[in-house]
UniProtKB/Swiss-Prot annotation:
Belongs to the cytochrome P450 family. Induction: P450 can be induced to high levels in liver and other tissues by various foreign compounds, including drugs, pesticides, and carcinogens. Keywords: Endoplasmic reticulum, Heme, Iron, Membrane, Metal-binding, Microsome, Monooxygenase, Oxidoreductase. GO terms for cellular component: endoplasmic reticulum membrane. This is Cytochrome P450 2C15. GO terms for molecular function: heme binding; iron ion binding; oxidoreductase activity, acting on paired donors, with incorporation or reduction of molecular oxygen, reduced flavin or flavoprotein as one donor, and incorporation of one atom of oxygen. It comes from Oryctolagus cuniculus. The gene is CYP2C15. It catalyses: an organic molecule + reduced [NADPH--hemoprotein reductase] + O2 = an alcohol + oxidized [NADPH--hemoprotein reductase] + H2O + H(+). The keyword 4Fe-4S does not apply.
Length: 378
């Protein structure tokens, strides 16, 4: 069920429907950009409330991408203080920590252990159940107010599809799983990237200063950043690409099954075999990115300072199984980061050289260490 872990026809149907629906609601178009810009303004106002005092930005940075997904799926955003929203965010944050823990890696290799031993995998199961119940309640609300001639969001479109076509793939269970997948993939990955981004900019203040200089020159102070600005901001674009390359957020891709027997480089791979690819092998390829362990925006700039694309840049995976929400995630990273740096100077509580940027947990995802900073208005 869903998109992330399904295969064959189920995956094709869910991916096709999800892509089509997200595009119809403007992913990569103006309407979604409006939603992200609105959320960026809310994010800036929330950061302003810190009054330049030391704070851990993790939670606030998680709220913004989660609210964008909420607006697409539920047709409404939540206040950052909303009780249900806070609980949902708490579950998502906890799940990423659990999924990235050594214990979960052991459970993946020896699944029989999960039936007999206590452990955090049980918390993961409970959190997933909570999320699915939350989504199901929203689905029930949508069923009561559904207007087939005027779909409001992703859930409405799915319910209409269920009614129109009696597909085995389009069921309530599949709807809940697909929405859960969109939440999981569209919230935590972006929020974790944002959190690590600010940490890296604290570690490299000269990079942050150059980005702010470009923002001042291209956008100024009197309007919000928009996606049209990106093509005129090669350094900022290079910095965002380098952040994603350097952090290698999902080092090992999700497992996917081979659909038919195949021979690859003298290896025979039978149908049904699960394949796990290493994204690190391309993102940290020494031939493409000299000194790959060094954070250097120059990896994505040519000699003239223009943005330089790379076929090795694939933090969203590659091929037909690449992330459905890549366009949305790239939009969020650009608009959220430029909005933050347009309005604030990032101030570290310790000397940049003393900042530890080593991932605390490195399993499913690279999770940054806890840190604090001050958002000083500019």
């Amino acid at each position: 069920l869903g998109i992330l872990f399904s295969n064959a026809n189920t995956w094709k149907e869910m991916r096709r429907f999800s892509l089509m629906t997200l595009r119809n609601f403007g992913m990569g178009k103006r309407s979604i950009e409006d939603r992200v810009q609105e959320e960026a303004r809310c994010l800036v106002e929330e950061l302003r409330k810190t009054n330049a005092s030391p704070c851990d930005p993790t939670f606030i940075l998680g709220c913004a991408p989660c609210n964008v997904i909420c607006s697409i799926i539920f047709h409404n955003r939540f206040d950052y203080k909303d009780e249900h929203f806070l609980k949902l965010m708490e579950k998502f944050n906890e799940n990423v920590r659990i999924l990235s823990s050594p214990w979960l890696q052991i459970c993946n290799n020896f699944p029989v252990l999960t039936d007999y031993l206590p452990g955090i995998h049980n918390t993961l199961v409970k959190n997933i159940e909570y999320t699915k119940n939350f989504i199901m309640e929203k689905v029930k609300e949508h069923q009561k107010s559904l207007d087939v001639n005027n779909p409001r969001d992703f859930i409405d479109c799915f319910l209409i599809k269920m009614d129109q076509e009696n597909h085995l793939e389009f069921t309530l269970e599949s709807l809940v799983t697909t929405v859960s997948d969109l939440f999981g993939a569209g919230t935590e990955t972006t929020s974790t990237t944002l959190s690590i981004s600010l940490l890296l900019l604290l570690k490299h203040p000269e990079v942050a200063a150059k980005v702010q200089e470009e923002i001042e020159r291209v956008i100024g102070r009197h309007r919000s950043p928009c996606m049209q600005d990106r093509s005129r901001m090669p350094y900022t674009d290079a910095v965002i690409h380098e952040i994603q390359r350097y952090i290698d957020l999902i080092p090992i891709n999700l497992p996917h099954a081979v659909t038919r027997d195949i021979k690859f480089r003298n290896y025979f791979i039978p149908k049904g075999m699960n394949i796990i690819t290493s994204l690190t092998s391309v993102l940290h390829d020494e031939k493409e990115f000299p000194n790959p362990k060094v954070f250097d925006p120059g990896h994505f700039l040519d000699e003239s300072g223009n943005f330089k694309k790379s076929d090795y840049f694939m933090p969203f995976s590659a091929g037909k199984r690449m992330c459905v929400g890549e366009g949305l995630a790239r939009m969020e990273l650009f608009l959220f980061l430029t909005s933050i740096l347009q309005n604030f100077k990032l101030q570290s509580l310790v000397e940049p050289k003393d900042l530890d940027i080593t991932a605390v947990v490195n399993g499913f995802a690279s999770v940054p260490p806890a840190y604090q900073l001050c958002f000083s208005p500019v």
